[in-house]
C-alpha cells in the first residue's frame, strides 16, 4: 500500500533529521562525509532539511580517491557551493600515497577504496573533528547491517560491534 510506504519513509526521514540535529547539538566539531554519490547526496539533502532555512552548521568532507568521473567532481563542487552554500574540505588519497602514508595497490583488481581510511583519519585529526557522519545502505554489505547510528571507532578507525552501546532512540 502506497500510503504505508510513504508513512514509513516519512518516519525514516524524520528520524534521520532528528539524529543529524542531535549530532550538531552534541558534538563540537562534526563533519559530514560527501563524495557527490547518491548516498552522500541523500545525507546532504537530509542535513539541509534539518537546518532549513539556515546553513549547515558543519562542513562537508570528501576523501578523494581521484578515480571518480570528472562530472561527479564537477557536480560535487556545484552542489556544495550552489545548492548548500556549505564549506567543502577535500583530502586526497594520492597525497597520502605521495607522502608514504599508504602504498598503492597494484594488479587488475587494485582499488584505492581501502586506502581512504588513512586519509580520513589524518583529516579527522587535522581538523580535530569529533564526529564524522556518513551514509551507507545496510542492504549492501553484511558488516553494514550490524552498524548502528553511532559506530564508535578506536584510534585506528576500527569498529568492534561487541563494544557498541545500545541505542534506545524510540524508547522515550
Where do the language-model regions lie?
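Nucleotide-activated chemistry modules centered on ATP-dependent adenylation/adenylyltransferase
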Residues: 1-172
